[in-house]
Amino acid sequence: MIKITQNIECSNAAPFVLFGGINVLESEDLALTACAEYVRVTEKLGIPYVFKASFDKANRSSIHSYRGPGMEEGLRIFEKVKAEFGVPIITDVHEIYQCAPVAEVVDVLQLPAFLARQTDLVVALAKTGKPVNIKKPQFLSPSQMQNIVQKFKEAGNDQLILCDRGTCMGYDNLVVDMLGFGVMKRTCDDLPIIFDVTHALQNRDPSGAASGGRREQVVDLARAGMGVGLAGLFLEAHPNPDQAKCDGPSALPLDKLEPFLAQIKALDDLVKSFPPLVIG
C-alpha cells in the first residue's frame, strides 16, 4: 500500500483511486474548470481523487505541437489548483533538474514510459522521497518492470505505483494485455497497479504529426481493465476533446465523467467484494 496523502492510500485490494484531469495545462482556467468537475463527481461518488496534468509534453510527435506552459508556470497553476480544491496532484518530469522543484509542489511524480529505463532520471526521482508512478513502456513486457522497480529500491525509494498504458502490437497500434496486470503484481511484490485507459486508446496515423484515438471505446476498455482488480484508474477528460491541444481523440468528454465513473465504481466495488481465489 502506498500512502499518497493522509487520507488517500493506493492498494490493489482497496477501493480504486482516480488519477484524473487533463492531458496538458492549456490554461489556468481549463485546469480549474476540469478539476472542479472532477472534485464534484468524485466527492458525490466517494472516489479518492488525485488531479493530473502535464506542464510540458516533451515527447510530442511534431516540433510544432503545443507542449505546455513550462515548469515555472505549470507549478504556479498547480499551486492554484491545490489552494482552491485541496486535492493532491500528480505530474510527469522529463529532466533530472525538474525533479526537486516539482517535488516541492506535487504529491506524486511520474516517470514517462519512454524514459522509464533512464537510470539517472530514476535515481533523481527516487531521491525526492515522493511516491513515483512508473509508466510501463509500450515496448516492455510486464515482467521486465521488476528491473525498473529494483533500480528505484536500490536508489532508496520503494513508494512506487506501476501504470500500464498498453503495449505495441505491430505498427501504430496499442493493445492492453489483461493478463499483464497479474504478471506485474506477482513479479513486482504486489505494488499498486493503475490503468491508463486514455493513452491505451491511442493509435497512430502513419502520415500524421499527432496521435489518433478511439475514445468511443473508453467504456469497454476501462471496464475490462478495472475488472481485474486494480489500485487505480488514470483518466483524461476535456470539455471539448476535438479542440484539445493534445490527445483529444482519446479524451473522455468532461460532461460524461459522472456516468462513466459511476459505472467504474460499481464494477470496482463488485470485484473487490469477492473473496480471494487463488488457482495454481
Swiss-Prot record:
Gene Ontology CC annotation, any one: cytoplasm
Keyword Transferase set for record: yes
SUPFAM superfamilies per record: Aldolase
Main location: cytoplasm
Keyword match Phosphoprotein: no
Cysteines joined through disulfide linkages: none
Location within or outside the cell: Cytoplasm
Family matches, as InterPro entries: Aldolase_TIM, DAHP1/KDSA, KDO8P_synthase
A Pfam family it matches: DAHP_synth_1
Catalyzed reactions per annotation: D-arabinose 5-phosphate + phosphoenolpyruvate + H2O = 3-deoxy-alpha-D-manno-2-octulosonate-8-phosphate + phosphate
Involved pathway(s): Carbohydrate biosynthesis; 3-deoxy-D-manno-octulosonate biosynthesis; 3-deoxy-D-manno-octulosonate from D-ribulose 5-phosphate: step 2/3; Bacterial outer membrane biogenesis; lipopolysaccharide biosynthesis
Record-listed E.C. numbers: 2.5.1.55
GO molecular function, one term: 3-deoxy-8-phosphooctulonate synthase activity
Keywords per UniProt: Cytoplasm, Lipopolysaccharide biosynthesis, Transferase
GO annotation (BP), single: keto-3-deoxy-D-manno-octulosonic acid biosynthetic process
Annotated NCBIfam families: KDO8P_synth, PRK05198.1, PRK12457.1
Record family assignment: Belongs to the KdsA family.
Name of the featured protein: 2-dehydro-3-deoxyphosphooctonate aldolase
Protein's organism: Pseudomonas putida (strain W619)
Gene name as annotated: kdsA
